[in-house]
Amino acid sequence: MTILKKKKKGSPQITPDERYRELDSHAQNESEIQEDVPISRKIANFLKLAYNEIRENISIYLLIIVYLCVCVMNKLLAKRTLKKIGNYSFVTSETHNCICMVVFFALYFMFGRRVMSAKERHRNFGVQFLLISLLDACSVIIAFIGLTRTTGNIQSFVMQLSIPINMFFCFLILRYRYHLFNYVGAFIIVVTIAVVEFMLSFETQEENSIVFNLVLIASLIPLSFSNMTREIVFKKYKINILRLNAVVSFFQIFTSCLMLPMYTLPFLKQINLPFSEIGTNIKNGFRCLFLGQNTIVENCGLGMSKMCDDCEGAWKTFIAYSFFNICDNLITSFIIEKFSTMTYTIVSCIQGPAIAIAYYFKFLAGDAVMQPRMLDFVTLFGYLFGSIIYRIGNIILEKKRMMEAGNDDDSEGELTNADSIITH
């Protein structure tokens, strides 16, 4: 029996991975930064890291830009649609759900069925689809009530609270773990928007109620659970995005009916609808949307009990809104599938300042064009700075996971060598 310092035949030779060499170089750079080095060297190292981050994730950043453009157009066209046919919300909601269902099912049968996973092919996801639809419906209904006495500035701030709410539930249910920079980045985004919206609140005299503000905040909870359910279905069962959106749209045709009794609530002001008038409202809504016929033209307008109809060409605005909303749903599902609920939450929060800036351009906003405000750019800067800090936290966590994986591989290699050095 002899002792040889060599491995068994067939055992793969373990060589350092290029990724870990790069990580070692990063670690050396970090140790250099901690020493007395010129400011220019620190800036150069930071710019190099930023360049590598953008180069390695260029597709992600392009997707974010596309998603941002789609979101801005979706929100602008939603407001234009509301201005034209705001008296018939139920009709527009149900018609939009039907359009989404037809489009998603058509796309699924043309492209989606060819790439079905084995788990998706042998499992029925009706319960998960229904759960997502019910959670979305609950979120819409609760938000519908909260929005009635929540001013526009407070609405914008409440939407940003989805960041800490999603972080909490993802930590609790999906077992996410965060770096300190994740918390700091999220905190910067929320505080920046809170300060700006607090300053803007002094410029408005609209009615606002703290109780309804809390109701609006509560609507973010079912929305968070809906997104987490999507993430679980996507990542655990590899379900097709088109199939999920198609079936969810089908269920939403029925869950939207849950909103009908909400229109009878007396505090809904201009959109209040007595129960006895629901049938007439639905009929007039179809006439407005498809025939362009105005019904409510007298005793209506700003400060009155009803909005005035502006049905001419309403179907064009509505179709454009439906198109961008469908694109929004597809990109949202793709981000949640490929990345995570928190990635989508952080990305979606840029909508607020981006939409505010979009209202500066008449060709986008139409009659709702606004004058530029410095506070909107401050909000955008705060969001971008907070997002960069949040992303740095993710990079650090990814680096730690890679280092741990490298250590595990090295320890396995040492055990293999120890077993193989004793040979005959």
Curated annotation (Swiss-Prot):
Outcome reported for the amino acid change (mutating residue 384 to F): Increases amodiaquine transport with no significant effect on chloroquine transport
Transmembrane regions listed in the UniProt entry: 58-78, 90-110, 125-145, 154-174, 180-200, 209-229, 247-267, 317-337, 346-366, 377-397
Taxonomy, superkingdom: Eukaryota
Basic and acidic residues composition-biased segments: 16-29
Major localization class: membrane
Vacuolar side: 79-89, 146-153, 201-208, 268-316, 367-376
UniProt-recorded Gene Ontology molecular function terms: xenobiotic transmembrane transporter activity
Cellular-component GO terms for this entry: vacuolar membrane
Residues carrying sugar: 87
Side of membrane Cytoplasmic, spans: 1-57, 111-124, 175-179, 230-246, 338-345, 398-424
Keyword entries, A-Z: Amino-acid transport, Disulfide bond, Glycoprotein, Membrane, Transmembrane, Transmembrane helix, Transport, Vacuole
Family named by the database record: Belongs to the CRT-like transporter family.
Name the record gives this protein: Chloroquine resistance transporter
